[in-house]
Amino acid sequence: MKSRFLFALVCAAAFFSGRSLAAPSGPELGLQTWTCRNMTFDQVVDFATKHGLKQIEFIAAHLDPAAPRAESLRKKAILDAHGLTAYSFGVNRPGLDKEENRKLFEFAKLMGMKVIAVEPQDLRAWDNLEELVKEYDIKLAIHNHNLDSVYGNPATVEKVLAHRDHRIGVCLDIGWITAAGFDAAKVFHDYGDRVYDMHLKDKEIVTNDGKSVAVDTEIGKGNANYAGLFAEIKKSGWTGVMAIETDSKAFAENPSRLVDEARVFFNAQTANVKTVATR
């Protein structure tokens, strides 16, 4: 009888140990340091830590690919000590010189990054960039700006993706895709599984001297179709980083309020997106 009881306890322990809670699925909130462009690297670290943002995409002013190796490693050690991850950097504009572009990949490898946000101005650069993607096994994410920019129209991006390595994908700037006149939810859907990064940004179109101008707003208060986008995120099971970013000089002067409100909005939108596995 005793042996049977012990056997039952062992079985129960094994059963419940297998039902450990997995990390929540769904997107993760991050920070694009263009938002903190008036800060130093150390100030960015303090800001991100204070606001609980662990996934950081850096601009060169804070983490420079051209810096000496020792300097990059020093900064990486600081990030590690604060529990922060430099998951990407950009937006970079690589050109036709493959060996010059190699420096970006070497830097990403050194920092442990899995994706680089890029916006090459010459479409011919994709030949050498694809070779580097295959060599380093590091993803490239095409960033979009306004409609007049090289990748402002998703149709241009789709042409690049069509015959390129699957590790070449998209960094979807939600604010700019909206300002360019596209529905962020539809664009996300149409890109399929090629979205590797997103910039959490919002813009509204206003008229200034008879011209339409895109103006940054708090996240969720502009023209971006966030309800539709998060519905698509839930449907697809996308689990990348949505990095808070603003182009507004006013917001960048003191981004704390923007970031705090973005977190509230993000949490509300993802409340029904994230799920917890039980096996």
Predicted regions and their residues:
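Composition-driven detection of intrinsically disordered, low-complexity segments
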Residues: 7-9, 80, 250, 279
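Active-site acidic/histidine proton-transfer and metal-coordination neighborhood
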Residues: 43, 62, 78-169, 179, ...
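Histidine-acidic metal/acid-base catalytic patches
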Residues: 21-29, 37-52, 153-172, 178-279
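Solvent-exposed loop/turn segments at secondary-structure junctions
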Residues: 34-38, 61-65, 91-96, 121-123, ...
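Bacterial N-terminal signal peptides
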Residues: 7-17
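Residue-level preference for nonpolar/small residues embedded in alpha-helices
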Residues: 40, 71, 100, 124-125, ...
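N-terminal pre-domain/capping segments
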Residues: 2, 18-115, 149, 193, ...
